[in-house]
Structure formats: C-alpha cells, structure tokens
C-alpha cells in the first residue's frame, strides 16, 4: 500500500517547529505519523523562505536556520515555476502564496492531499484539503 503524500502548509510546519500551544498537538501527531512511516511529507521552497522570515523576526537567525534544516531533512521540497505563478494569478485563490503552493503541488503529481489550518483558502482546490486535526 502506498503511503499518502501530504503537502504541509507553512502554518502547520510553524506550529510544529515553534511548538505553538494552540495547534502543536495536532501538528505533532501528524509528524508522528511520518516518523512511523505512515505518510510522506512535502512542502515548498516558498514555505521555507516564509518560515525563515517569520522565525527570524520572532526569535533569531540561529533558530530560523535550525528550523529550516529540520524541514529540509524530513520533508520533500517542491519548487514553483512560471506556470504555477501564472496559474495562481489567474485563479480564484484570494491568497497568492496559497495559489502558488497549490499549483506547485498539483503540477508535481506527487501530492495526495493538502494539510493546512486555512482550509477556507483552498475551497476551489481539486486536491483533498484537511486540517491537521482532520488528518
């Protein structure tokens, strides 16, 4: 049986690496599934760049760098291309970043579902979308 391949949005990864109290439990359970070999985790280079910016502002560059190294070790990273950007601009996504991530994941043909706390931002998605709690 193939393991589900999950694209994890930045909010969920930040919940995990920063242990954000309100959401850490479900992000940690999702990561535990990966550690048990029950799923494969994906994210994007855009997520890594945004995470570094956010963590550096909240903490410092050392914590930002170690967080990125953690994600880079455990997640497969998908890149965005020109078509993903054009598709995001022409789509019904109200959040450009979410659109780029979605079209990158869709184009890769490697993703079975998206996991995010912002499910409402993906209401036009063709891929299944779950919160960490739902997954």
What kind of feature is each model-predicted range?
Residues 1-5, 103-135:
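Acidic, PIN/NYN-like endoribonuclease modules and their adjacent C-terminal/linker elements
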Residues 12, 47, 84, 101, ...:
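Alpha-helix capping/helix-boundary segments
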Residues 43-47, 64-77, 118, 123-135:
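Anionic, Ser/Thr-rich low-complexity intrinsically disordered regions
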Residues 73-117:
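Active-site neighborhoods of divalent-metal-dependent phosphate/nucleic-acid chemistry enzymes
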